[in-house]
Amino acid sequence: FYGASTIMRFGKNMNPTTLSALAAFPSQLEAHYAAIPPAFRHWTPPSWEGVPSEAFTAIEQLCHVRDIEIEGYHVRFRRTLQESHPTLASIDSEPLAAERNYGAADAAKVLADFRLARVQTMEIISSLSDAQLPRTAVFEGYGPLTMRSLIHYLCSHDQQHLAGLQWLAGKIDASTVAQ
């Protein structure tokens, strides 16, 4: 997705491991989704106890990641850069999933839209100056943070959803065991 030289150009005062993870995530997300058997992409387990992400089916995980990238992090980045210490909203994901009928989404389109959004995210990050990384905001549920913090939280969100897809894969496999 992005080569090492591009990541280094993005680097400035950002951790290159974080930047590499952000750049690699679209391919990882697609691979994790592809590993879910097609018959289980809309499947829900009998219990969501222990899920490391929101309680979403595999297709719903994709839609959520796309929407949080665009309507969550793009907006948060813009506001943190343009406003003085803004309060950044947390998005209530479950009503959004129901309203947008995530379960009926076309995975290929969702993944393509997400890839484009992540390119835009990496462009935003690559354009940041050293003076912009410490800009501050308050994020609902997280408290005070910096622009740099937001970038780390986005990377954490990515990893949370890879873990959610792995958790679903484990539950799918466990569902084949007789009770």
Positions of predicted regions on the chain:
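Aromatic-glycine hotspot motif
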Residues: 1-59, 67-179
